[in-house]
Amino acid sequence: MFEEMILEKVRKEAERIAEEQGLEIFDVQYRRESRGWVLRIIIDNPVGYVSVRDCELFSREIERFLDREDLIEHSYTLEVSSPGLDRPLRGPKDYVRFTGKLAKIVTKDGKTFIGRIESFVDGTITISDEKRKYEINIDDVKRANLEVEF
């Protein structure tokens, strides 16, 4: 079966399982890597953080589906994980959800901003560092992620 078809079927079932478990699908990847084929499903918890238990329960359910449907003809590794502490920020919902958290934003013109997300209103992200506040239009963002705090 073609990779795109496998990915589509797995994503659909992953979204169903995630919804049942109060989770969301952050990403689904199926690709060949140096150690062989990898099916990577990244889950998210919209009201908190993903626990090891969340990954375990989700993994069991998706494994049942994969075994039953037998979509992948060759050997592969299944990985279920969270987006991580330094997770990418991928849209308005994330900027609202992570208000108060430390983030790094790189704009399309190459500028880098590191600061706390203060707000997201009408397409504008406001972040601040120790010195000042910055307002960044979401359309100008090339990439953004949370920064790990120690």
Swiss-Prot record:
Keywords: Cytoplasm, Ribosome biogenesis. It is found in: Cytoplasm. Its main location: cytoplasm. GO terms for cellular component: cytosol. It holds the Pfam family DUF150_C. Signal peptide: none annotated. It comes from the Bacteria. One of its GO terms (biological process) is ribosomal small subunit assembly. The keyword Hydrolase does not apply. Belongs to the RimP family. Required for maturation of 30S ribosomal subunits. This is Ribosome maturation factor RimP. It comes from Thermotoga petrophila (strain ATCC BAA-488 / DSM 13995 / JCM 10881 / RKU-1). The lineage of its organism: Bacteria, Thermotogati, Thermotogota, Thermotogae, Thermotogales. The gene is rimP.
